[in-house]
Amino acid sequence: MSEEEGRERAVTVEGDAESMNDGRALVQPPARSGDVITPTRAVLTLSKSMFNAGCFSLPYAWKLGGLWVSFVMSFVIAGLNWYGNHILVRASQHLAKKSDRSALDYGHFAKKVCDYSDIRFLRNNSKAVMYFVNVTILFYQLGMCSVAILFISDNLVNLVGDHLGGTRHQQMILMATVSLFFILLTNMFTEMRIVSFFALVSSVFFVIGAAVIMQYTVQQPNQWDKLPAATNFTGTITMIGMSMYAFEGQTMILPIENKLDNPAAFLAPFGVLSTTMIICTAFMTALGFFGYTGFGDSIAPTITTNVPKEGLYSTVNVFLMLQSLLGNSIAMYVVYDMFFNGFRRKFGARFPNVPKWLSDKGFRVFWVLVTYLMAVLIPKLEIMIPLVGVTSGALCALIFPPFFEMITFWTDWKGLLTYRQRMTKIFINLVVMAIGVFAIIAGVYTNIHAIIQSFSQPDP
């Protein structure tokens, strides 16, 4: 073999080894510039996307599931979410590198998975898969934003409802309408740097409000020895749905990773994802445990309404309403990030004389109004939260990531892993997907039952 042929073969082998990459040894990507954020701000933004209205319904979720069943399930759900988020980012980074893209959002990632697949059916229907993923994420984000409106409305009614007439349902609609104006204002900003600043300010309000709630909660007589360890199937499934919703940052994973100045910091051992998951799991477990053991069967659908309305405690509602107001723009950012470019291209081609700023703001106003209508149609936190969490939440956390990972690395695993290692990975992913399918089927059934029961009862 000549020296030139030897060099060519060395380059070919090196290229093959690089292409067969299951994500364990990604080449250090170049630093990004422009509208980017640091790892610290990424942790704050991702934590804020999880620390939201759903957290304060966790004590109520523990009541539905039972004390010790809920305690165990909290760690199981956290672990499943962490696993799904980790393999999602790993596969996304791999495909972004493979397709010479700096980053991929969830929908285009799903399309790339199918485009590079060995399965002809997936290659021929890659756009359909992308649309399905996008619609799922759209429903998830809109559900989260409608929950934020409900949370604000619920706390406003808790503060001033005694001075208003009408039923609680009418009061909730009135307060949702009042909050709509302020939510529209916070959704007029487009850059991740501004959105992450909102997340920072929102986190301050959240920490203050959560600290006051925890301080009041731990002062209550502890009832842990009197509470049931488990309840029933329906209650447990509803608890799982509400806990899945509490980890509502699944759809923010890729948008934040895409804006990180150093992408390698996201999956590092003490990087953005692991740090965020540890913080969130510890806080959510503590809030659920102490909230339920402190108030017992009297715990409300959101623990903020168990706190007194006078003195320092009355400010808790205000702080948490402000954090939900600012946090709403974080959740809606995903919708704008995924759909606006396509909308602007098609809308601009059909209506070229409409100013770009008008189409931009009109697009944002439209989706905010959709979340408002969702909140008005189902103005009950205890129904909306598990409904969103157990459907779109389970799809985004438990079904899409393992499915896409297997398709992405299927060929690479054959060349890099032993048969036993490959079968172990496939088995783990299939188990996670089976859990997700079961959660969706059981969750939809229990939530439909809860909706029928709720609306068949007279409104107080």
Swiss-Prot record:
UniProt entry tagged with the keyword Isomerase: no
Cystine connections: none
Subcellular location: Membrane; Cytoplasmic granule
Record key words, sorted: Amino-acid transport, Membrane, Transmembrane, Transmembrane helix, Transport
GO terms of biological process kind: amino acid transmembrane transport
TM spans (from-to): 64-84, 132-152, 172-192, 194-214, 236-256, 270-290, 316-336, 362-382, 383-403, 426-446
Main location: membrane
InterPro entries (UniProt xref): AA_transpt_TM
Gene Ontology CC terms: vacuolar membrane
Functional note: Plays a role in the accumulation of vital dyes and endogenous fluorescent compounds in lysosome related organelles. Has an effect on lysosome related organelle (LRO) function, in a pathway with serotonin.
Similarity comment text for this entry: Belongs to the amino acid/polyamine transporter 2 family.
Protein name: Probable amino acid transporter skat-1
